[in-house]
Amino acid sequence: MTTQNNNNRIDYIEFPAAGIAATVKFYTAVFGWKFTDYGPDYTSFEDGRISGGFAKVPAIPGNGALIVIYSSDLEKTQAAVVRSGGKITKAPFVFPGGRRFHFTDPNGNELSVWSEK
């Protein structure tokens, strides 16, 4: 993931995956993506332009990919989401590389915001 020079831009796309090993095998064979594993439940990829990841889930949800936006000030962005009518669906939590929270916009789309701080 990138940092401050991309403040408030889409930075990362996260997909749900039923199985990490099969997912890595598929995307490596088809598109040549490079992967970095973070344990049995998560892997990240680089395709040369954008980065993303696959998170193991018990069932693939109907909402598909998770768009992740970078913010240099997580708390300020979280407050703006709530103030503007969004709903926090996952409170800020720590993950390898920083912290993030999830929210739904007024249309019900789920997104996430991350910061290295």
For each predicted feature, which ranges?
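A short acidic/small-residue loop/turn micro-motif
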Residues: 96, 116-117
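Conserved acetyl-CoA-binding loop of GNAT-fold acetyltransferases
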Residues: 30-35, 85-87
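Vicinal oxygen chelate
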Residues: 69-110
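N-terminal beta-strand motif that seeds the catalytic metal site of vicinal oxygen chelate
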Residues: 1-24, 65-67, 117
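Amphipathic alpha-helical "stalk" segments
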Residues: 1-4, 46-50, 76
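Catalytic core of tubulin tyrosine ligase-like
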Residues: 27
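Conserved short beta-strand elements that form part of the metal-binding/catalytic scaffold
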Residues: 33-64, 110-115
